[in-house]
C-alpha cells in the first residue's frame, strides 16, 4: 500500500497531540515559576521542555531519513492516511495541449498544457462494518508538478478557468464521497517545453501535518509522487 506516511497515522497523531499537551503543561509550569520567582523550578522545567522538543523533532528526523521516494505509474494509487487510510488518489490519464477551450474563454499555454485526470476513490476495504455509509469530506489538498531540474509548477489558473468554462473540469477535489464511490478531476499545469520527467505531488495542505512524525510533509521526508 502506497501511503503519505511511514508511521501508523493514529500513532503519529497521538504522538503529536501528546507532545503538544506535555509542552503546554511544561510551559505553564515554567511561566508560573517565573511569576512566583521560583527560578530553580523554572530552569528545570525549561530544560525538560527543551528535552521533549529535542526528542520529538529527533523522531521526526529519524522517520524522515528512513523514508524513501516513490514514483507511481499510471493507475497506481496513493492512500492518504489522516487517521484511517480511506482516500486513494491516482493519475488516470494525461493529455497535452497548446490551447484549451474556444473563443473568448480559450487559454493558450506559455509552454504546453498538461491536463491531468486525477481519480479520487473511497476505498471501502479500509472501513469497519460499524462505520456505515456516511459521507467523508476530503481535507484540503496541495497539487504541484516537479521536473527533473527541481522546478515547480502549480495548477494553471488560466488553463483551469478555460477548462471549467468548457464544462470539462470534472468533480472538485473537495467533493465528499461514500464508501466505494469515486470521481475524476481534471487539473491543468503549464509546463515549459524543456520540462523533463515531470511528476505530480498530491499532498495535504494543513499546517499541522508538517509536525507529525512520519508524515511526508515533515522536514526532509521523501515524497510519493505520480509520473506524468
Residue ranges and their predicted role:
Residues 92-98, 119-125, 203-207:
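Generic short beta-strand segments
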Residues 64-71, 132-136:
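Short linear motifs in intrinsically disordered
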Residues 89, 118-120, 187-189:
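Preference for bulky hydrophobic residues occupying beta-strand positions
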Amino acid at each position: 500500500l502506497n501511503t503519505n506516511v511511514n508511521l501508523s497515522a493514529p500513532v503519529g497523531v497521538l504522538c503529536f497531540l501528546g507532545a503538544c499537551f506535555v509542552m503546554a503543561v511544561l510551559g505553564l509550569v515554567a511561566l508560573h515559576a517565573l511569576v512566583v520567582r521560583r527560578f530553580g523550578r523554572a530552569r528545570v522545567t525549561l530544560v525538560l521542555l527543551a528535552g521533549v522538543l529535542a526528542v520529538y523533532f529527533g523522531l521526526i528526523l529519524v522517520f524522515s531519513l528512513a523514508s524513501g521516494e516513490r514514483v507511481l505509474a499510471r493507475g497506481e494509487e496513493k492512500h492518504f492516511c489522516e487517521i484511517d487510510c480511506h482516500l486513494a488518489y491516482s493519475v488516470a490519464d494525461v493529455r497535452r495541449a497548446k490551447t484549451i477551450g474556444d473563443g473568448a474563454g480559450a487559454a493558450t499555454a506559455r509552454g504546453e498544457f498538461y491536463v491531468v485526470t486525477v481519480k479520487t476513490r473511497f476505498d471501502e476495504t479500509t472501513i469497519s462494518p460499524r462505520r456505515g455509509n456516511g459521507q467523508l469530506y476530503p481535507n484540503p489538498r496541495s497539487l504541484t508538478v516537479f521536473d527533473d531540474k527541481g522546478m515547480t509548477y502549480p495548477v494553471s489558473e488560466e488553463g483551469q478557468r478555460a477548462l471549467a468554462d468548457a464544462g470539462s473540469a470534472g468533480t472538485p477535489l473537495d467533493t465528499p464521497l461514500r464508501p466505494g464511490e469515486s470521481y475524476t478531476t481534471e487539473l491543468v499545469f503549464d509546463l515549459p517545453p524543456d520540462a523533463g520527467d515531470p511528476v505530480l505531488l498530491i499532498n495535504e495542505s494543513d499546517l499541522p501535518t508538517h509536525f507529525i512524525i512520519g508524515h511526508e510533509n515533515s522536514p526532509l521526508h521523501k515524497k510519493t509522487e505520480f509520473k506524468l
